[in-house]
């Protein structure tokens, strides 16, 4: 009995290292992304939208491709932050791409699609005003 306990005790570090180097890496990147999202929320409360957009971009790079719905929600929030940080043309293109992607899938969240359409419509409105302020003729 003592040998079995000793063998288990000696194998425990090997199991821990195997977990850390395997599935633990994914958990660590998810934790890092979560930390960035919390920072973005804190910065949003301070109206520091350019920093919020940077945190969202970093978190988006860390998220795995399999997390489609979370990535789409994050892309929407990134575009909203870009709109508020004077990056309107970039946000408008990103929202257009997101709306097209959500319509093609058809399986995704309808509320997310409605939110993306609403944000895209707002960006279109402000893009129109921006073009008028720059002196471009009406189409």
Label every model-predicted segment:
Residues 73-75, 114-115, 138-139:
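Short, charged, amphipathic alpha-helical segments
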């Amino acid at each position: 009995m003592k040998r079995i306990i000793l063998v288990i005790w000696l194998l425990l570090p090997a199991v821990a290292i195997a977990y850390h180097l395997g599935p633990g890496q994914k958990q660590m990147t998810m934790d890092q992304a979560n930390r960035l999202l919390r920072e973005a929320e804190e910065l949003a409360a301070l109206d520091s939208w350019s920093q919020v957009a940077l945190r969202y971009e970093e978190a988006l790079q860390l998220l795995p491709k399999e997390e489609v719905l979370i990535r789409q929600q994050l892309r929407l929030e990134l575009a909203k932050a870009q709109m508020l940080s004077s990056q309107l043309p970039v946000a408008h293109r990103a929202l257009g791409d997101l709306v097209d992607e959500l319509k093609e899938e058809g399986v995704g969240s309808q509320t997310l699609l409605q939110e993306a359409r609403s944000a895209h419509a707002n960006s279109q409105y402000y893009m129109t005003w921006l073009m008028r302020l720059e002196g471009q003729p009406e189409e």
